[in-house]
Amino acid sequence: MKKKSYYVLTLGTLPFAQANSITGAGASFPYPIYAKWASLYEKETGNKVNYQSIGSGGGQQQIIAKTVDFGASDDPMKSELLQQHQLVQFPAVIGGIVPVVNLPEIKPGKLKLSGKLLAEIFLGKIKKWNDPDLVALNPTLPLPNKNIIVIHRSDGSGTTFGFTNYLSKISNDWKNQVGEGKSVKWLTGQGGKGNEGVASYVRQMKYSIGYVEYAYAKQNQLAWISLQNQAGQFVQPSNESFMAAASHAKWHEKAGMGVILTNETGEKSWPITAASFILLNKYSDNPETTKNVLAFFDWAFSRGQDAATELDYVPIPADVVSTIKSQWKTELKQ
């Protein structure tokens, strides 16, 4: 057997001697910030990062197959899978999954929903926008006598994992009939590929409802809902409400820091907050490429945080970043 030696990263390995290119693929949830980071990084260093938004399932498959330099997933891999496939996992950014609607005359944040009502809509039990339960919660809104058009993801998706994980915590009917996962058997609705596809469908189709990462909602000028959290408060998606949820995370208790941030406590917490994770092969066939990937994320953690905040993502806390960098030194090998 070939002897394995530790791949040691120090800050001294990070300066950029010459231009290089790395490739990544996976979650569409963080695509807006990864694209922004890649643009800023290339301007500053000359190094290129090519990231393809193909969904978390595809990102996991491609890093396992070693067809990309890094994978990205919003559905954190469990300890046994990380060990089985000899992968290293760490969080890169935090954001929010938001239900969005296309209802004429109803502006962002005005429609109130509880988690239970949201589940019943996606189960197909609530079929009309003027359903009595929706009207009771929104007595002043002009809810139309129109069928609700449900839009969900058609691909393996970490955004779907976060959304269905939340609904499984809120609704026993959802947990028993649909459950959670990157791909589930939907009981109603039609599918769009990627956050991009869901956002496009909701934008085009009146009386529809879907779920996307918050940056996609803003970029597509979609109306998000006000969602009731565990504390009983109706909150809107924002950098602050995502940060409130993330403040309760116990990063160091999970393998690969794979925390789930849905339905967190706190009066200001957004109920469907999620971290997005990077996956690297522990044993690299090309140590120089691994070094280049780490250089990019080292740059993102130290110089890309303002860009993350501008796009309404939450940067990874400094103490967690310190742990991540220690993890790079001890777990990545060649």
Swiss-Prot record:
SUPFAM superfamilies linked to this entry: Periplasmic binding protein-like II
Keyword terms, alphabetized: Periplasm, Phosphate transport, Signal, Transport
Gene3D superfamilies: Periplasmic binding protein-like II
Residues that coordinate or bind phosphate: 27-29, 56, 74, 157-159
Tagged with keyword Zinc: no
Biological process annotations from GO: phosphate ion transmembrane transport
Taxonomy, superkingdom: Bacteria
Keyword tRNA-binding assigned: no
GO MF annotation terms: phosphate ion binding
Residues annotated as signal peptide: 1-19
Coiled coil: none
Localization of this protein: Periplasm
GO CC entries: ATP-binding cassette (ABC) transporter complex; periplasmic space
InterPro entries: ABC_phos-bd_PstS (IPR005673), PBP_domain (IPR024370), Phosphate-bind_PstS (IPR050962)
UniProt family annotation: Belongs to the PstS family.
NCBIfam families from the UniProt entry: 3a0107s03, PRK10918.1
Role: Part of the ABC transporter complex PstSACB involved in phosphate import.
Subunit structure: The complex is composed of two ATP-binding proteins (PstB), two transmembrane proteins (PstC and PstA) and a solute-binding protein (PstS).
Protein name, per record: Phosphate-binding protein PstS
Organism listed in the record: Haemophilus influenzae (strain ATCC 51907 / DSM 11121 / KW20 / Rd)
